[in-house]
């Protein structure tokens, strides 16, 4: 039986779901992770938490299936995470889409007609 796997990394958790050819759920796993608020208006997630949540949810789903034909990945809006190309390590925490640290700059761009 062909199986489609979806990995949905949301704002506070990762969910991995396996579907059969008729889109019936075969298996589903979810792992939450904490948001970090280092300063007022800042919202971050530790990169290791994000990666661990993928492994934690994907492993049992894949192990319960055979004949995986595709894996789709969704993520949380404009959350940004930068990795060092040489070391493979994250440069900083993921900056979550809710983060407001650049609100003033964005407002200025909008006022200048750069929307």
Label every PLM stretch briefly.
Residues 98-115:
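Glycine-rich phosphate-binding loop plus the immediately following alpha-helix
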Residues 1-92, 104:
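N-terminal glycine/serine-rich phosphate-binding loop of ATP-dependent small-molecule kinases
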Residues 95:
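Glycine- and other small-residue-rich loops at beta-strand/loop junctions that grip anionic moieties
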């Amino acid at each position: 039986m062909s199986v489609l796997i979806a990995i949905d990394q949301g704002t506070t958790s990762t969910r991995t779901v396996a579907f059969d050819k008729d889109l019936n759920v075969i298996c589903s796993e979810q792992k939450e992770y904490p948001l970090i608020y280092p300063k007022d208006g800042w919202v971050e997630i530790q990169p290791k938490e994000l990666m661990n949540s993928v492994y934690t949810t994907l492993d049992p789903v894949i192990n319960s299936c055979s004949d995986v034909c595709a894996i789709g990945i969704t993520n949380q809006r404009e959350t940004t995470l930068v990795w060092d190309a040489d070391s493979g390590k994250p440069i900083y925490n993921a900056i979550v889409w809710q983060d407001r640290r650049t609100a003033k700059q964005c407002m200025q761009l909008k006022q200048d007609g750069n929307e």
